[in-house]
Every structure is written in structure tokens, then in C-alpha cells.
Regions:
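Exported/periplasmic cell-wall-interacting domains
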Residues: 1-118
Length: 118
């Protein structure tokens, strides 16, 4: 990714773990900008931790019927009342678990309220 195109979590407009608009989060996986790669907090953190600056990244095009070589993670959707990324490790697991049990977060989550695989 070059120029003004970046890998990043969803922009929230302030430095808070609780300033996310659910409608923006629920757009993950669809085109919503000028080419940036938007991802969950957990995925952005993984990339930051494991890919050095200047690393080459190969973008694989896929879809739900042919998801690419690494598969396709389950999509997590959040209700309009949720103002945080469910994969954000800074949000207490108890909060995620409560919202998941109440049906405000859908998708594959562990019993502790974390996204499967993290």
C-alpha cells in the first residue's frame, strides 16, 4: 500500500475506546473510502506488532464463496448502542460478554467476549 492509502482501524474522531459509531464498524468488509484498508482493532494491532515498516503486503481479492488462501473470518456486527470495537483488548471482557449475551454483538465470540482467534 503506497501513497495516502493506509491499513488502519476504524477512525473514531477522538482518542477514546468508546467513540466508535456502530454504522462505521458494520461497514468492515465493504468499500467505504478512497482505498484504505479498514480493519478491526485486533487486526490492526496484529499488523502493527508483526509487520515491520516497509514490509511488502500482498492483497488477495476474495469473497464469501472464494475467501482466499487464509479463509474468511466470521463477521462481527454490533448494535447501534455499542460504541466500541468488540476486538479492542482495552475494553473489559465483562463488557463484551454482557453485550454479546444481550444480543448487541453478533458473530463468533468466545464465552469471555473475545473474538475467536485473539
Amino acid at each position: 500500500v503506497v501513497g495516502n492509502v493506509y491499513f488502519h482501524a476504524i477512525a473514531v474522531g477522538s482518542q477514546s475506546h468508546y467513540a466508535l459509531r456502530a454504522s462505521n464498524y458494520n461497514k468492515l468488509g465493504s468499500a467505504a473510502s478512497a482505498g484504505c484498508i479498514r480493519m478491526t482493532v485486533a487486526d490492526a494491532k496484529w499488523l502493527y506488532d508483526y509487520a515491520a515498516v516497509g514490509s511488502s503486503v500482498k492483497i488477495e481479492k476474495g469473497n464469501s464463496k472464494k475467501p482466499g488462501p487464509l479463509g474468511k473470518a466470521a463477521t462481527i456486527k454490533i448494535a447501534e448502542s455499542i460504541n466500541y470495537d468488540p476486538t479492542d483488548p482495552s475494553v473489559p471482557a465483562a463488557t463484551k460478554k454482557k453485550d454479546y449475551k444481550a444480543g448487541r454483538i453478533s458473530g463468533y465470540m468466545t464465552s469471555k467476549g473475545k473474538k475467536v482467534g485473539y
